[in-house]
Amino acid sequence: MRYDKELTENEMIRQKILQQLLEWIECNLEHPISIEDIAQKSGYSRRNIQLLFRNFMHVPLGEYIRKRRLCRAAILVRLTAKSMLDIALSLHFDSQQSFSREFKKLFGCSPREYRHRDYWDLANIFPSFLIRQQQKTECRLINFPETPIFGNSFKYDIEVSNKSPDEEVKLRRHHLARCMKNFKTDIYFVSTFEPSTKSVDLLTVETFAGTVCEYADMPKEWTTTRGLYDPTHVIWTQA
């Protein structure tokens, strides 16, 4: 019994070390990362940290870093106007050619084809293994008809990064609070996005906030596109 308890405590320590490493890797995808750096940070030898990572995560450490960098690249390809060469070099690929080759292995097309598709296929996105302390949200899709919404729009630029978008959340909450104060009905936030014209590193987000009821002081109209939506992200309901 004592042995089992010690084993459990040791596993918890290892898991904590791995979570710290995963956080460090996520923060350094656009910086050089070597096995020596990871071994030094973890306190394990090169061989032991690779064995530990593979045993717990079921994927080799080097492969995990490579796929996370490729997924970071996919986000930059889709959401920014950065050149393929800049993306390749920022994520420490040897060349644009080697980047394109690895990208095609994971996503089945070249980075340029990926950028210009009229849809975003997320099937091969390799997510981070980070365990985040947050409440799980049940995802469900609803058929939402083409609907005219009356309200106002606001626009802002954000950096495409792994950091928490605190300023963006604060801005959207400000507009939501104002809508909830004025209207006792369902409130809709509908957003579109495109690469910013101000900087290749930025993304421009335009959000239309409003209701299906027309009010005198909300003159603008936005008609939603008919299709499948996740209501937890699109519709904000007055409590």
UniProtKB/Swiss-Prot annotation:
GO terms for molecular function: bacterial-type RNA polymerase holo enzyme binding; DNA-binding transcription factor activity; sequence-specific DNA binding. Residues 36-57, 84-107 bind DNA. Signal peptide: none annotated. It comes from the Bacteria. SUPFAM superfamilies: Homeodomain-like, Probable bacterial effector-binding domain. GO terms for biological process: regulation of DNA-templated transcription. PANTHER family: HTH-TYPE TRANSCRIPTIONAL REGULATOR YKGA-RELATED, RIGHT ORIGIN-BINDING PROTEIN. This is Putative HTH-type transcriptional regulator YkgA. It comes from Escherichia coli (strain K12).
